[in-house]
Amino acid sequence: MIRISDAAQAHFAKLLASQEEGTQIRVFVINPGTPNAECGVSYCPPDAVEATDTALKFDLLTAYVDELSAPYLEDAEIDFVTDQLGSQLTLKAPNAKMRKVADDAPLMERVEYMLQSQINPQLAGHGGRVTLMEITDEGYAILQFGGGCNGCSMVDVTLKEGIEKQLLNEFPELKGVRDLTEHQRGEHSYY
C-alpha cells in the first residue's frame, strides 16, 4: 500500500524517539477522492489507534492508516530527500484525488484515471489541466484544456508529443486524441 524509504523511516524514528512510548505515525488523506484531497502524516499515540485501522509494519516503525484513507493511499511513497538546500519529507500519493481503477474498468474510466493521476500533475506545473470529454466510437479521446494550457502556443506539442504518446502507449485501443478547446490566448496562457 505505502512505501516508506529507509531515509524516511530513519527520520520518523528520530522524531518518534522524543514522543510518548509506543507512539507511531498515522498517514491519512483529507477530502479523499476529490480535487481538494490532501495527504498528511501525524503522530499516532497508542490510544489513538482504531480497531478499523490498517497497521503497516516497517523495520523502524509502524504506520497506521484509517479505513477511509486506505484505498486512496495505494501506491503512495514517502521519502526523506537531502540536497544542497537542505532536507525535506516528500509524500507522493497518486491515487489521493481519484481511486485507482481496475484494469478491466471501462476505457473511459481508465483514461480519466491516467489523466488525473499522471498527466494533470505534470500540467499543473504550468497552471494547466486537461479534461476527458468523451471517447468517440472511432476510438479518439476528445480532450479539453484549461488554465495555463488554454491559448498556450505549445498546446499542440503537449497534445501530440506528450499526452497522445502516453495515452496510446497505455491504451492501444485508442486511435488518437483530439482537442475540443476553443483556445483564447491571454494572461492565463503559459506560453
Curated annotation (Swiss-Prot):
GO terms for biological process: iron-sulfur cluster assembly; protein maturation. [4Fe-4S] cluster binds at residues 149, 152. GO terms for molecular function: 4 iron, 4 sulfur cluster binding; iron ion binding. InterPro entries: Fe/S_biogenesis_protein_NfuA, FeS_biogenesis, FSCA_dom_sf, HesB-like_dom_sf, NIF_FeS_clus_asmbl_NifU_C. It comes from the Bacteria. Binds 1 [4Fe-4S] cluster per subunit. The cluster is presumably bound at the interface of two monomers. NCBIfam families: PRK11190.1 (NF008392), YhgI_GntY (TIGR03341). Homodimer. Belongs to the NfuA family. This is Fe/S biogenesis protein NfuA. It comes from Cronobacter sakazakii (strain ATCC BAA-894).
